[in-house]
Amino acid sequence: QDSSSAASDVYKRQIVDLHAITIPYEPKELKQNTEQMAIDLLACGIDPEKSILFIQSLVPEHNELAWIFNCLTSYGELTRQTQFKDKSLTQDKQGKEGFISSGLFTYPVLQAADILIYRANYVPVGRDQTRHLELTRNIAERFNHRFGEYFPMPELKLTTIPKVMSTADPTAKMSKSLGEKHAIGLFEEEASMRKKIARAVTDSGDTPEGE
């Protein structure tokens, strides 16, 4: 998630490790992955002189604001977030301990806190995140109505490629959480990449969403 200020032109980029613990995980592996993510982002060109790169869990205000936002969000709104349904089904299919955490259900509220805590004006996301941003705007509007104008209404800024589809299932977004065969890693071996691309399910027509 990025936010920028016209005055300072500094981008805030966070590694969202709190979101990562909403599904079953190994603590040691999470720590290693978090550190590796920071290294990878810097290697990909993030400039520390122009960006603030930080780990989400090291800023406790994210959780504090998320709790306030939880109390401004209805159960019905969260049930309409399609990604919760999708991820829950994925975990069931993969047999991941048969445990669906409440954190997975409420993580869109934490996502709203991630955005609004920095009073972001624009949020660059894929098209699949539009419903989450709509929820974020609703939460900001309720907060402002109750406590006074404070949060700006963040605007959607779609990325150039709205959604990259899975190499194994053309109806799903590419995601490592679906399994190794569904995604191509940034530093994956060339032979493995070629194998996945060669086996990828393709179609001569439009994708399910015409993308």
Predicted features, each with a name:
Residues 49-63, 82-92:
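Short, glycine/charge-rich beta-strand/loop segments that flank catalytic centers
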Residues 33-53:
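A glycine-rich helix N-cap at a beta->alpha junction
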Residues 1-7, 11:
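Single conserved hydrophobic/aromatic residue that forms the stacking wall/gate
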Residues 73-84:
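Acidic, His- and aromatic-enriched active-site or binding-groove loops in soluble protein domains
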Residues 85-211:
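Active-site cores that bind ATP or allylic diphosphates and position pyrophosphate for catalysis
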Residues 1, 14-16, 113, 127:
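Active-site flanking residues adjacent to catalytic metal/cofactor-binding acidic residues
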Residues 12-24:
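Short, conserved active-site loops that position catalytic residues or coordinate cofactors/metal ions
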Residues 21-39, 64-72:
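Glycine-rich loop at the start of a catalytic domain that most often binds anionic cofactors/ligands
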